[in-house]
Amino acid sequence: MRPGNPEALSLPYDPSRIEPERYAFWEKLGVFQPRPDLAAAPKGTGAALQPVPPGGGAPFVMPPKGTGAKAPFVIAIPPPNVTGSLTMGHVLGESIRDTIVRWQRMEGRETLYIPGMDHAGIATQNVVEKKLRAEKKSRHDLGRDAFLKTVWEWKEQYGGLIFQQERRLGTTPDWTRERFTLDEQYSHAVLTVFKKLYDEGLIYRGRYIVNWCPRCRTALSDEEVEMVETDGHLWHIKYPLKDREGHLTVATTRPETMLGDTGVAVSPKDPRYTGLVGQFAVLPLVRREIPIVADDMVDPKFGTGAVKVTPAHDPNDFQTGRRHGLPEIVVMDEDGKMNDAAGDFRGLDRFEARTRIVAALQDAGYLEKVEPHRHNVGHCSRCNTVIEPYLSWQWFVKMAPLAAPAIEAAKKGKVKMFPARWKKVYLHWLENIRDWCISRQLWWGHRIPVWYRGEEMVVSLDAPEGDGWTQDEDVLDTWFSSWLWPFATLGWPDDTADLKRYYPNSLMVTGSDIIFFWVARMIMAGYHFMGEAPFAHVYFTSIVRDAQGRKMSKSLGNSPDPLAMMQKYGADSVRFCMVQTPTGQDLRFDEKALESGKFFANKLWNATKLVNMRMGGEDLSGVKESQLRLTLADRWILSRFANAVKDVTRNLKTYRFAESAQAVYHFAWNEYCDWYLEMAKPRWALADLGDAMTDEQKADLRTARWVSWKVLDGILRLLHPFMPFVTEELWQSLPHDGETLAHAAWPKAKKSWFDAASEKEVSFLQGVVVAVRNLRVESKIAPGKPVPVFVRGEASQLDLLEKLASQITPLARIEKLTVSRDGSRPPVAASAVVEGAEIFLPLDGLIDLDEERARLAREAEKLLTDLEGVKKKLRNQDFLAKAKPEIVAKENERLVQLEETLDKLKRAQQSLSSVRE
């Protein structure tokens, strides 16, 4: 047992002082590194954190019997962009992840918390190119090698800022294992995967329609496109028929692409156009003859029922064109400007071209009408530019074969998602999955390992032998590297010791916004390359919104600076606020919640100072529980502590972080600080007797000290995963075992401490004290003025009150407590009812009788309302038919209690009425 350092609490609670000091303390001790000495788990037991199902069940998947080992607990940080800085969304995720990691560490598990960063191809290249533009330069001015050198220099100077911020939050990854997706080892894994998939026939190159960002000048995956509802127009354009009178009217939202039309499509079921199928129309402005084809993709109810077919600029038209053998004419360049195929409109920006083309159609008499039209328009998720469906050569992954085991994993429960509703979203996407475009027209990233020489093509991690080979200019999608995160961070493709020990991971905690980008793909990669799921569970964090319910964003300016919040309130307060997000619900962030967290930390600070002071330096390490003289208050707080341990642990196991945090908060503040410490004060005061204490008094004092310290120690352990800094500081001030609270054992709910009888008795005591306090306030009697109290009730209640009198009188400032066994009561008194017992506070000469009558009238009115509500419920046949029998029984019990209480209240009203007479 190490002696505490109570002098550390001599200064007021100041998180800005203690938090940096404590983080440095943990790092120096090596707290964040995994400790294989804690357990030696066999392979395959890493996926260990299993929530308890409703009704109970084994909380963990433990190693096989006979191993005597606990499985390692492994979790990875979703790698933030190298350009990133801490947001409230990051704070939420990191607070939850670190809470779990710290808890598992205290449970005696070997924990590995893997940090790392994503090179973030588009985002990082955009940042550096913006810097170059400010210098009147472009990446092309520098050339590829010089540009990449500039990006690496930028990364070394500015990258990783977010990890410094996460340290401030108190997160505990093993920083010695920090990974970067462009590290040499990780890059080797990425390129190895490309070659493996290519050799298996799952990667191919083709000329297809892709999502193209003219600003970033690269292809985007479907998941990188954000659909924005936009007010646009529907232009109705006349397409003259060839060699006959008349025309077809075509409706389009994108007239600028009509220059690339190579057909007009109608529904084969549309009788209006049956005679025109196989004929030709003449493309306005261009005068190109284009066929009229019948295709099932046409909705006869949309627009005119005839649609233009532009195979090079629309994904649906691309498929239609392939079915009918239509030419594919690209009319734009990669920067969104019209090319030579656009004729007179060449060189114009696509939106300027739209305006000019509509004007030309109007002038030539081809424009029939224009209608307002609200529709979804794709935008680049990185720069918010309107994307362009664009025909180009790209590399793709065939996803259907990879998706099959990932679908089965979710359906059979091998991978579980929390909240469970995300399973349906996940399965819908996988069951309708499209091939993944993985090539990007960037320079920053993993360059595609494909080499060309004339007509030859070689897929190789290294340049082929011989001269004349050139490497593919494109790089791989950033997500093509991050989908390997659970095993590439452990050394794959090499068969490393880390990979054997720590794969699969135990849990993934991430945002639901990347369920497709990342989570689903990680599961696919895990099964394909490792033969098993990368983790057993996925917990999806909530969206952080402001007090008005708006999603936090830079554009709205409604996202607070997390560092400023931590400086003002402390990282502990920020963490404690964030983890109280109800599972499956968005978090409405309110700064007042941070104030509450700081008040709580300060409450614990002062309580610990008090306990330290009252312990008087006594060494309690050798005290055995059997030697103690436990009072009712002691038995009650130990029982409540055992229940708190059970509640906090159960809720952590089931990912109910809010309920877990609230359980320890309620116990620490409302029960330990507000009640037990007050009840212990009379025994603490025995120390003032010094040598005059009797042996019994010494035992009473030692017991009060031991229980106060033991329960406070347990509170700090329960709270440590949520509020690590202040709990470590307070724990170090108390006598303790070990060097750090971070490695202290998680509390256990000791069976012998559960004491329902003591809890029931103290509940009655609390009810009486609260009732007397409330009567004082309502009767406007000074808080410090001792008052007499009379109690009338059942014999068992009166016996208990006499037994508890020494506890009740100081807590309620009672001058004299009188139990009325003959049914008498003061003639003029304020009254309350506690569990059927009547509490009377004599008022003769102390209060205004009219005010007391008004108070009783208000209480009676409330009771009548409650009584009518219960009666109405019990008259409801639907309720009686559907409710469980025990629920109906409780309502009947409540009815009886309300009627009895109302009857006693009426008698009190009659008593006051008789006084006036």
Regions found by a protein language model. Name each.
Residues M1-L49, P53-P54, P59-S85, R105, ...:
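Non-catalytic terminal extensions that flank enzyme cores
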Residues R2, P12, E21, K28-L29, ...:
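Residue patterns forming the tRNA-binding/recognition surfaces of aminoacyl-tRNA synthetases
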Residues E110, P255-D335, Q362, A812-E815, ...:
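Catalytic alpha/beta core of large soluble enzyme barrels
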Residues G68-V128, T181, V190, V250-T253, ...:
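N-terminal catalytic cores of NTP/NDP-binding nucleotidyl/phosphoryl-transfer enzymes
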